């Protein structure tokens, strides 16, 4: 279980030890990233040689984290304290641009009584 910006985020439909008391709607956060010439040149050279293109891997990892953060902030705006069923979607926007989109169901949860 991960907490981002004070929001619990999980990929499952339930959170052990908690119950969902209210559904607030879809929380979403997206980011579009484009590479720059230096990264493109390094990527081209790595592509010729083969292997992982670390410049793009790092860029996409940063974009995923930012999309998650934006989704958590949107969930907070909706009045939620958790996001369940979180997923990522990616889109190639042409050239060297890509969109990373994080989304899930914003909910209010409470601890279950034992």
Swiss-Prot record:
SUPFAM superfamilies: YbjQ-like (SSF117782). InterPro entries: UPF0145_dom_sf, UPF0145_YbjQ-like. It holds the Pfam family YbjQ_1. It comes from the Archaea. Belongs to the UPF0145 family. This is UPF0145 protein PYRAB04900. The lineage of its organism: Archaea, Methanobacteriati, Methanobacteriota, Thermococci, Thermococcales.
